[in-house]
Amino acid sequence: VQEKAVTYPTDGKLYERCRQHLVRLSRRYRIKLWQNYSRKAPYLLLMANRYHSAKQMKRKRKALKQLKTLVGRVQRDIERQLQAQPEEVRSAFDETLEKTRRILGQQRQDKDKLYSFHAPEVECIAKGKAHKKYEFGVKVGITVTNKSNFVLGARSFPGNPYDGHTLESCLEQAEILSGTRAKE
């Protein structure tokens, strides 16, 4: 697994990143928001993390629900005001609004969740180890020589396929790049 530079993706962090991106974009295009919750949202995230460490899960859920509501308010405010804006401004917001909708709508058991705002290709890969159960990144196959560990090829495999199914394509790529066939 080639890990990406992402922190452990909690719901609260993703909500706060959505809010930050939306507020930053609205400032850039001079869209006046009714409220941007620049004090309340980080405070709610902090409190949710505090409640989690104190094992006060009901309070944590309440804080996260409030945070999610605030992000939804900012999103709807921007969507309302974009109707009066020119097409180029609307197109600048398309990707960010789509990611925000996706993050606000995803549930725990959903497939194809968004784990990172800046790197949407990140997947959750279960490792089966006690100390590190999950890694967030993309599965890769790296082909090296037997004696000197010289890298012949590297390839990413989106969708977390079974390792045995990736071997043939890695060897094929190494054969194409090096010009020699691998020995059995």
Question: How would you describe each model-predicted region?
Answer:
Residues 1-184:
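Anion-binding and metal-coordination hotspots
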